[in-house]
């Protein structure tokens, strides 16, 4: 089932697992057990994410931020219970510098200007887009000049190996530093699902930011790749292809191994803020590293 009448699009991808997306800005995921639910990331702080979630479950909801970045924690203020890896707590409580988000606002405007042409081309020739992957206008009355993402205070700090019990379903915390020092993935071993945050993406994976660490990224992805045989789906936080099969874990690990070995080819590129970076292209993803 999809629901796309608002800024958020939702789809139940697996039993008890819903995509809650602001396409293509960010993909959040709601995971429900018998007793409680977990919302993995809260998006940009635009639109009513709590309303989107309460339309899917009446269970108590714990927010888990996969890392401190504003595009994963922007909607935290709509919820009471928030958790993050302990290394991200201070940055989460500091909140973002909104002035530094102005390039993203410009990027978003450019994207919306081009959506109509892209969608028409897609409908005529390709059929890639679906409701939950099609960019949509910002909510009525939204103005970037008034956009604010308040700091948030976590109620629980996470560490590697912690188990979150939802009642009949558990999620295990995997600390996967690389994108940021506090980055985590969440593993549903029983159902073979891995929620990758920004450790995995189907577009460029960001390994070029000031607190990114390419070698740590390689170690993290190599570790998670050891679990690939038990993973059916990998859920990613950005871009329209929000779910990949488990072998994607092996591909990403191999890509980072190639990069740290000095064997990857790069081209000059930019990120969505217009920042300079170098891009290594692989079959189903890319990796941005610092110039």
Q: Model-found features: residue ranges?
A:
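Accessory terminal helices/loops
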Residues: 1-2, 98, 135-139, 203, ...
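Short Pro/Gly-enriched beta-strand edge/turn motifs at strand-loop
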Residues: 10-15, 141-147, 167-169
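Active-site HxH/HxHxD metal-binding segment of metal-dependent hydrolases
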Residues: 48-163, 202, 251-262
């Amino acid at each position: 089932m999809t629901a796309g009448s608002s800024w958020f699009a939702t789809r139940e991808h697996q039993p008890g697992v819903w995509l809650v997306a602001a396409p293509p800005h960010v993909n959040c995921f709601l995971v429900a057990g018998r007793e409680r639910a977990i919302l993995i990331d809260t998006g940009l702080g635009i639109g009513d994410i709590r309303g989107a979630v309460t339309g899917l479950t009446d269970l108590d909801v714990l927010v888990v931020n996969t890392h401190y970045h504003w595009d994963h924690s922007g909607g935290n203020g709509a919820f009471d219970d928030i958790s993050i890896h302990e290394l991200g707590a201070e940055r989460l409580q500091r909140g973002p510098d909104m002035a530094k988000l102005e390039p993203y606002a410009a990027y978003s405007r450019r994207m919306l200007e081009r959506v109509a042409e892209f969608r028409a081309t897609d409908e005529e020739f390709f059929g890639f887009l679906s409701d939950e992957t099609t960019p949509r206008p910002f909510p009525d009355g939204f103005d970037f000049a008034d956009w604010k993402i308040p700091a948030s205070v976590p109620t629980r700090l996470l560490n590697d190996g912690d188990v979150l019990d939802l009642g009949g379903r558990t999620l295990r915390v995997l600390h996967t530093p690389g994108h940021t020092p506090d980055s985590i993935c969440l593993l549903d071993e029983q159902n073979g699902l891995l929620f990758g945050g920004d450790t995995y993406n189907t577009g460029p994976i960001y390994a070029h930011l000031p607190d990114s660490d390419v070698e740590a990224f390689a170690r993290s992805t190599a570790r998670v790749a050891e679990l690939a045989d038990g993973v059916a789906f990998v859920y990613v936080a950005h871009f329209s292809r929000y779910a990949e099969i488990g072998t994607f874990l092996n591909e990403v690990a191999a890509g980072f191994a190639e990069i740290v070995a000095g064997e990857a080819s790069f081209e000059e590129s930019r990120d969505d803020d217009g920042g300079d970076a170098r891009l290594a292209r692989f079959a189903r993803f890319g990796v941005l590293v610092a110039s």
